[in-house]
Design a protein with these regions (language model features):
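Flexible, glycine/charged-enriched surface loops at secondary-structure junctions
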Residues: 83, 187-193, 261-267, 313-320, ...
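A glycine-rich phosphate-binding loop feature that marks nucleotide/adenosyl-phosphate handling sites
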Residues: 86, 90, 114, 193-200, ...
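Long hydrophobic segments that form regular secondary structure
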Residues: 210-211, 245-276, 346, 353-401
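Glycine-rich active-site loop/lid that clamps phosphate-bearing ligands
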Residues: 313, 317-373, 426, 430, ...
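Active-site "cap" helix and flanking loop/linker of ATP-utilizing ligase/carboxylase catalytic domains
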Residues: 240-274, 282-334, 415
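Short, well-ordered beta-strand elements within core beta-sheets of diverse protein domains
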Residues: 161-163, 194, 240, 376-385, ...
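N-terminal beta-alpha lobe that positions the nucleotide/phosphoryl donor
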Residues: 1-267, 271-286
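Flexible, low-complexity "carrier/transfer arms" centered on conserved reactive residues
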Residues: 349, 395-530, 537-539, 543-559
Length: 559
C-alpha cells in the first residue's frame, strides 16, 4: 500500500479546487502551483502550500516538467494529481513523476503512451473487437469519401481538428490542423477518418484498480459541441437503446482490460443509429465527471486517490439515480463564432449550491481571464428525477447566474437549454455548426439613431449623476451593422499565422483575410463587407495585442 500524505495538483482553476476539496476531506495535505498570472487565484489561497512555477505562458509554468518536479520537492509532496489538460495525458510526465519517487494519480506511463495517441489507440481498439471508423493516409484520401474529419493524433479538446467537405479544401485543412496540433501538443501528426454528419458523442466512464478490477460507471452524452469542444454534457445518454448501451459499455470495459488500464479514464464513441465507433480514450479525469458523480453519488477524485494508494475498488453500482446535465461557462462571444474572450469580471454571482445543484469554478468578482489559458470559467451541473427536471433545474440556476464586465456564453446557454431542440434531445455533434442562428432569436433590423446611441452621453434636464452599468446580450442578433467602418482588429492577443489579403485587393463579405492564433486555437479573420483592402497592419509571425488593427476594408459604394 502506497502512503499518500501530500498531493501536488499540477493544474489551476476549478479542477485544482476540486482536487483540494476531496483531498482535504480525506485528511491529505495539498500543494498548489501557480504562474505569475495566477498568483492571486483562488486555488492558490485554498491549498495548504503554494509554489510559484514561473511566468504566465503555460510552456514556462504548467507545462514545465522540471518546474513541477522542483515544486514537489520544495513542498514535500509525495503524489501528483494532474487534473485535466496541460500534462494530464503526458506519458513523459507520468514517468518523470515515478522516477522522482512521486505517485502519479492516473494510469501508468506505459498505458498513457499506448492510448494517448489516437492512431495507436485505434489499433488497440481493433484488437479488442471495438468498432472503428475507416481511416486514410493524408495523401491518399479518395475523392468519393468526403466529408472527412482531420484530427490530431495527440491531445484533444478540438485542437488540430477540421471537418473537410470537398477534396480541394483538404490541403489547407491539413496545414492548419498540423500547425494547431504542433502548437498545442508539440506533435503535428494527423489522422483522417470518415466523418459522420449526424452522429452523437457518447462516452463511458471507466474506473480500474491495480488488482485487475475494471468497472464502468455508465455513459454520458456530449453531443452539444462548438469547434469540436463540448458545451453541454449529460448522463445517462437520452437517445440510445438498452441494447446499444450494453454493447458500448461492454466494449469500453473490454478495451481497458486488454491494455491493463488503472485509475479513471473515459472511452469515447461516435454513435449513429444503432452503430457505434471508437474515437479515443482519455487517460484522465474528464471535465464532465460531475454529471457522473451526481447520478452515481460517487466521488471520482477520492476513488482515483484510493486506487493510486493501491487499494481495491469497493463494490460499485453503475445504476444511475435520476439525470444530470452540465454546462460549461466560457469567456467567449457566442454571437461571433464563439471567439474566446479575455478580461476582468467586475461582478460574479453564482447560484447557491444544493444537493441537486453544483457549481465548479474559480472565478470570483474582480477575477481575470487571461489569453494564456483555456477560457472555461465554470461548470454548472444540475440533477433531477428525470431529464426534464434536470433541464429545468439548470435553467433556473443559470437565471441566477451573473457575470458582468466579461463577455461569456451565458446568454447562449440559457437560450440553448430553453430550445425545443435541446428539450427533445434532438441535437447532434454537427447541430451548432449547421444551425449557427438557431440558438438565437431571429435577426432584427436596426433602428434609426437615437440619443441613447451617443458614446459620450447626453442630458435632457435634471442634474448630472455618475453611473456605471454592465450590459448583457439577450441572444438577439442585429441584421446588419449600420456603422461598420471596415476595421478588422485582433479580437484578443495572439500570433498572426497567415495574411491572405493585400492592399488593393477586392474582397467579398466573409472572405478570409488572415489567421490569428490565440489560446492555442486558430481564428480566421474575415472581411466585414464587400470592398477594397486599404490597409494590412501585421505580418506573419507578429505578436499582436488586443484591438490591434490588422486589416481595413473600404466598403464599395452602393449603386
Amino acid at each position: 500500500m502506497t502512503n499518500i500524505q501530500s498531493i501536488l495538483i499540477a493544474n489551476r482553476g476549478e479542477i485544482a479546487l476540486r482536487v483540494i476539496r476531496t483531498a482535504r476531506a480525506m485528511g491529505i495535505r495539498t500543494v498548489a502551483v501557480y504562474s505569475d498570472a495566477d498568483a492571486s487565484s483562488p486555488h492558490v489561497r485554498a491549498a495548504d502550500v503554494a509554489v510559484r512555477l514561473g511566468p504566465a505562458p503555460a510552456s514556462e509554468s504548467y507545462l514545465s516538467v522540471p518546474a513541477l518536479l522542483a515544486a514537489a520537492r520544495e513542498a514535500g509532496a509525495d503524489a501528483v494529481h494532474p487534473g485535466y489538460g496541460f500534462l494530464s495525458e503526458n506519458a513523459g510526465f507520468a514517468e518523470a513523476c515515478h522516477a522522482a519517487g512521486l505517485t502519479f494519480i492516473g494510469p501508468p506511463a506505459e498505458v498513457i503512451s499506448a492510448l494517448g495517441r489516437k492512431d495507436a489507440a485505434r489499433e488497440l481498439a481493433e484488437q479488442a473487437d471495438v468498432p472503428v471508423l475507416r481511416s486514410y493516409r493524408a495523401d491518399e484520401v479518395p475523392g468519393d469519401v468526403f466529408p472527412v474529419l482531420v484530427k490530431a493524433a495527440s491531445g484533444g479538446g478540438g485542437k488540430g481538428m477540421r471537418i473537410v467537405r470537398e477534396p480541394e479544401a483538404l490541403a489547407e485543412a491539413l496545414s492548419a490542423a498540423e500547425r494547431e496540433a504542433e502548437s498545442a501538443f508539440g506533435d503535428g501528426t494527423l489522422l483522417v477518418e470518415r466523418y459522420l454528419e449526424h452522429g452523437r458523442h457518447v462516452e463511458v466512464q471507466i474506473l480500474a484498480d491495480s488488482h485487475g478490477t475494471v468497472v464502468h460507471l455508465g455513459e454520458r452524452d456530449c453531443s452539444v459541441q462548438r469547434r469540436h469542444q463540448k458545451v453541454v454534457e449529460e448522463s445517462p445518454a437520452p437517445t440510445i437503446s438498452a441494447d446499444l448501451r450494453e454493447r458500448l459499455l461492454d466494449a469500453a470495459v473490454r478495451l481497458c482490460r486488454k491494455v491493463g488500464y488503472v485509475n479513471a479514464g473515459t472511452v469515447e464513441y461516435i454513435v449513429s443509429g444503432e452503430e457505434f465507433f471508437f474515437l479515443e480514450v482519455n487517460t484522465r479525469l474528464q471535465v464532465e465527471h460531475s454529471v457522473t458523480e451526481l447520478v452515481t453519488g460517487l466521488d471520482l477524485v477520492e476513488l482515483q486517490i484510493r486506487v493510486a494508494r493501491g487499494e481495491r475498488l469497493p463494490q460499485l453500482s453503475a445504476r444511475s439515480d435520476g439525470h444530470a446535465v452540465e454546462v460549461r461557462v466560457y469567456a467567449e462571444d457566442a454571437a461571433h463564432g464563439f471567439l474566446p474572450q479575455a478580461g476582468t469580471a467586475d461582478v460574479v454571482r453564482w447560484p447557491a449550491e444544493t444537493a441537486a445543484l453544483r457549481v465548479d469554478t474559480a472565478l470570483r468578482s474582480g477575477g481575470e481571464v487571461t489569453a494564456y489559458y483555456d477560457p472555461m470559467v465554470a461548470k454548472v451541473t444540475a440533477h433531477g428525477v428525470d431529464r426534464e427536471d434536470a433541464r429545468r433545474n439548470l435553467l433556473g440556476a443559470l437565471a441566477d447566474t451573473e457575470i458582468s464586465g466579461l463577455t461569456t456564453n451565458l446568454p447562449f446557454l440559457r437560450t440553448l437549454l430553453a430550445s425545443a431542440e435541446f428539450a427533445d434531445a434532438g441535437i447532434d455533434t454537427s447541430w451548432l455548426d449547421t444551425h449557427p442562428d438557431l440558438p438565437f432569436h431571429p435577426r432584427l433590423e436596426p433602428d434609426g439613431p437615437t440619443p441613447f446611441d451617443a458614446q459620450d452621453g447626453w442630458r435632457l434636464g435634471g442634474p448630472r449623476l455618475p453611473a456605471r452599468a454592465a450590459a448583457e446580450r439577450t441572444g438577439v442578433r442585429g441584421a446588419a451593422s449600420a456603422e461598420a467602418d471596415g476595421s478588422v482588429r485582433a479580437p484578443m492577443p495572439g500570433t498572426v499565422l497567415a495574411v491572405k489579403a493585400q492592399p488593393g485587393q477586392r474582397v467579398v463579405a466573409g472572405e478570409p483575410l488572415g489567421v490569428l492564433e490565440a489560446m492555442k486555437m486558430e481564428h480566421t479573420l474575415t472581411a466585414p463587407h464587400d470592398g477594397l483592402v486599404t490597409e494590412v497592419g501585421a505580418a506573419v509571425g507578429d505578436q499582436v495585442p488586443l484591438g490591434r488593427l490588422l486589416f481595413h476594408v473600404q466598403a464599395e459604394a452602393s449603386s
